[in-house]
Amino acid sequence: MKQHLRPIMFVGTCSDAGKSVINAAFCRIFKQDGYQPAPFKAQNMSLNSYSTPEGGEMGRAQVVQAEACGISPHTDMNPILLKPTNDKSSQVVLNGKPVGNMSAKDYFGIQNQKEELFKEAIEAFKRLEARYNPIVLEGAGSISELNLRDRDITNMRMAIAAGASTYLVADIDRGGVFGSVYGTIALLRPEERVLMKGVIINKFRGDASLFEEGRSLLKELTGIPVVGVIPWFRDIKIEEEDSVALDMKNNTYKDGKINVAIILLKRMSNFTDFDVLEMDPRFNPYYTNNIDEIEKADIILLPGSKNTLSDLQSLRANGIAMAIIRAHKAGKKVIGICGGYQMMGVRLEDPESIEGNIPAIPGLGLLPQCTVIEQEKITRQSDFAFLPSSENKDCKGYEIHMGRTTLLGDAPEQPVARLEDGRTDGYYLNNRCWGSYMHGILDNPAVLDNLAEGFDTETTTGPFDYAAFKEEQYDKLAALVREHVDMEYIYNSIKN
């Protein structure tokens, strides 16, 4: 039996410092070394979410980390999820289930409520700790937001409760790494500082030996050692949850590929649905709201949305809706997932004002259906057959939506998928026009091959195995971090 290890936690000097990816790396390292690790983040804010086997909803960053651990995702790994519905409020998901919408002012301002949520987070952590060893915790944003510190339940307060050996991750690519590391550590309270075991410099470009003096200077300034300098990399593909990652993605057409325009929505959710297209050499996916780039594409994908009616209203106002309709008439493929699927119908209705103040709006009119937004939230995983009449019976996906879609008039039932329990999903008008509620549907080789039908590319390839590809990436990430981090020091800091 492996020695019990203390929890380890990675916190940041800023958002997008690379905490989630480093957390995933250590999840895989501990798994490789014979431990049974599990990830944990007390509170996450994201529109990229996932439905667990039990039907609970959680952030996708912890799903990626669970995959790196080789275990099934569970809502205990992310007990509190905030899903922004507009610029000022979010849906609160507690232990996998929605408990209502709250403004940021109310969420951070009601102290009793924050205490109750923190208790829920602690209980989830304890349940995980009873089953796994070690727990690999992740903080959120910067740990030095003094105006939020007394109400922060994700960072150093969680580190103290867990008794976690804590490491500060700093993004050197942004510049100002000395000030950010020194300032962050200087602002720690004594009970927080005692947990801080080391600093990891992330996203270093060039020869890391040139930072040796920097290591010494930071140790001298803070009293805390730099235990790793991780290089900037682009050749290891790990799913990223933060919307800031979209800024780094491709946004233009390329010759010789199947060009896929993914429509940028203000409240876009689950853009991770399209990560597989970046890995399959047949496709060139790009995120855009530029009409010229949309009309040049071979395939147009409408993603999910946390505020479908509002996003559709914007598409109508800025001319993108008409561009999609013109592209469809010109023979381009148009495919929608979840909210994008709802947009493809004749009409969307929100009679109870669940999403906002738009009671109804015409859809794109590409599919013979109407959607009514409802209070009940569907969250479930599904095994299904893609195009029920075909042999593609071993597909997997998951649903997260608040809406019921029904066919209009005498439209024939032409589902995209038939689920194991006999239910059907989506509408398949033809190879050029279909939609589905199923997140992760493109991760299935049969669906990718259907997407590629009818196109000639310079790339010839067999079926793309995304699951195997991801496993390779986790191993490559672990190898990179092992090479550039003092693992002996790390292990010594978490051995009881």
Swiss-Prot record:
GO terms for biological process: cobalamin biosynthetic process. The active site is at 338 (nucleophile), 439. PROSITE patterns: GATASE_COBBQ. Pfam families: CbiA, GATase_3. One of its GO terms (molecular function) is ABC-type vitamin B12 transporter activity. It comes from the Bacteria. Pathway: Cofactor biosynthesis; adenosylcobalamin biosynthesis. Keywords: Cobalamin biosynthesis, Glutamine amidotransferase. The keyword Thylakoid does not apply. Residues 257-447 form the GATase cobBQ-type domain. HAMAP family: CobQ. Catalyzes amidations at positions B, D, E, and G on adenosylcobyrinic A,C-diamide. NH(2) groups are provided by glutamine, and one molecule of ATP is hydrogenolyzed for each amidation. Belongs to the CobB/CobQ family. CobQ subfamily. This is Cobyric acid synthase. The lineage of its organism: Bacteria, Pseudomonadati, Bacteroidota, Bacteroidia, Bacteroidales.
